[in-house]
Amino acid sequence: MPIDQEKLAKLQKLSANNKVGGTRRKLNKKAGSSAGANKDDTKLQSQLAKLHAVTIDNVAEANFFKDDGKVMHFNKVGVQVAAQHNTSVFYGLPQEKNLQDLFPGIISQLGPEAIQALSQLAAQMEKHEAKAPADAEKKDEAIPELVEGQTFDADVE
C-alpha cells in the first residue's frame, strides 16, 4: 500500500501539536516512615512481656556515667524492670553532657569512683588557679609603667 507523503506530512504536523495519550501523573512516593523503628519497639515490648517486666512510674531522670567523664542524661525517662532476669530498660532520648554541666543536683547520684574523679578534678582546678596568678605577675613584669609626660617616640626612630 503506497503512502501519500502529503497526508503523512499533514498528520505529523497535527500530531506535533496534539499529544496522543494522557498525561502521566507522577505518583507520590511513600515517605520513609518510622515503621522499622516501631516494629523494633513492638518486638522489644513482646520480649519484655515474656520476662514479666514491671513499669516503674515517676522516674524524673536517669544518668549513665561513661568512662570518659561524660554523662548520658535522660530527662524524661520510662523504666521497665524484670528483676528476676536482672534486666532494666530505659526509654527516652539521651543527651550527652559533661559532668560539670549537671552540678550540683547530681552529687547524690555519684558513686565512689565518680566522687574520686571529682576530687581529682577539683585538685587540678586548684593547681591551675594557683598557677594562673603567678603567670599573671610574670606578664606584668614585662610591661613597663607609663609615666606622664614621657614619650617613646625618640626610641622608635
From Swiss-Prot:
Subcellular location, principal: cytoplasm
One of the record's GO molecular function terms: unfolded protein binding
Domain NAC-A/B: residue ranges: 38-103
Lineage top rank: taxon: Eukaryota
SMART domains in UniProt: NAC
Subunit structure as annotated in this protein's UniProt entry: Part of the nascent polypeptide-associated complex (NAC), consisting of EGD2 and either EGD1 or BTT1. NAC associates with ribosomes via EGD1 or BTT1, and with the CCR4-NOT complex.
Protein family according to the UniProt entry: Belongs to the NAC-beta family.
The protein's name in its UniProt record: Nascent polypeptide-associated complex subunit beta-1
